[in-house]
UniProtKB/Swiss-Prot annotation:
Its cofactor is Fe(2+). Its EC number is 2.4.2.59. This is Thiamine thiazole synthase. The gene is thi4. GO terms for molecular function: iron ion binding; pentosyltransferase activity. Keywords: Iron, Metal-binding, NAD, Thiamine biosynthesis, Transferase. Glycine binds at R229. Transmembrane segments: none annotated. Fe cation binds at D154, H169. Pfam families: Thi4. It comes from the Archaea. Involved in the biosynthesis of the thiazole moiety of thiamine. Catalyzes the conversion of NAD and glycine to adenosine diphosphate 5-(2-hydroxyethyl)-4-methylthiazole-2-carboxylate (ADT), an adenylated thiazole intermediate, using free sulfide as a source of sulfur. It comes from Pyrobaculum aerophilum (strain ATCC 51768 / DSM 7523 / JCM 9630 / CIP 104966 / NBRC 100827 / IM2). Pathway: Cofactor biosynthesis; thiamine diphosphate biosynthesis.
Length: 261
């Protein structure tokens, strides 16, 4: 029995890793923006993989507001809640409260049911680039426990037509690309202190492409462009995820059309 268990895990896991080593879109971070983007991109028929460094979904959703089990979403993001069948309750002035556990579960289920592949426990270490001028064409990754151990282990590769940084406050993928491929012309400014109503609007406005093949969504947008943080209101994260999906899909379709022409 033990042999069969081991062989089943090894053979099926390696098959998945092989299948998703070449994708249309690689998303780094299974938080609200990353999971939202994954669902809307996968629904369009794109091959999508999501890498999450932890062994759980949700990013900053789970702790709620200072560990209180509620988060807030504004009126503009309610259509996305409805898409994912997430229940919400009115608060005041166009704000609604949502249960963090329900939001995590339904965002993840929505992405998976749409066809996205989520792989947990993955630390993205670097990007792949090609060309002059350069374009980001994929990722290098290792398992998170290896990265945490401090051991030097060479990573493996994932090729992608588009890479989305949804890693949160540190904008880890964009930061490493800015540092190691200066020809991309990326500058990571660092996020500012809180100004929620301004940040919720600006994070959506600035969501999109930062360099050829590389996109940013969610709170990582604040880090890249020097925007204020917003705290435990997540409508901007959801809307940012949906917007980056729309931008990536439009760009990939335009590139495919140009190749055919």
């Amino acid at each position: 029995m033990e042999l069969k268990i081991g062989r089943a895990i090894i053979s099926h896991a390696l098959k998945d890793l092989d299948e998703y080593s070449d994708v249309d879109v690689a998303i780094v971070g299974a938080g609200p923006a990353g999971l939202t983007a994954a669902r809307y991109l996968a629904e369009k028929g794109l091959k999508v993989v999501v890498y999450e460094r932890r062994f759980s979904f949700g990013g900053g959703i789970g702790p709620g507001g200072n560990m209180l089990p509620k988060i807030v979403v504004q009126e503009e993001a309610v259509p996305i809640l409805r898409d994912f069948k997430v229940r919400y309750k009115p608060a005041e002035d166009g704000l609604y409260t949502v249960d963090p556990a329900e939001l995590i579960a339904k965002l993840a289920a929505g992405a998976v049911d749409a066809g996205a592949k989520i792989i947990l426990g993955v630390h993205v270490d670097d990007v792949i680039f090609r060309g002059d001028p350069p374009r980001v064409t994929g990722l290098l990754w290792i398992w998170t426990p290896i990265q945490m151990s401090g051991m030097h282990v060479d990573p493996l590769y994932t090729q992608a037509k588009a890479v989305i940084d949804a890693t949160g406050h540190d904008a880890e993928v964009v930061s490493v690309a800015a540092r190691k491929v200066p020809e991309l012309g990326i500058q990571v400014v660092g996020e500012k202190s809180a100004w929620s109503e301004v940040s919720e609007k600006l994070v959506v406005e600035h969501t999109g492409r930062v360099a050829p093949g590389l996109y940013v969504a969610g709170i990582a947008v604040c880090a890249v462009y020097g925007l204020p943080r917003m705290g435990p209101i997540f409508g901007g994260m959801l809307m940012s995820g949906k917007k980056v999906a729309e931008v990536v899909y439009k760009d990939l379709m335009a590139e495919a059309h140009a190749v055919r022409a």
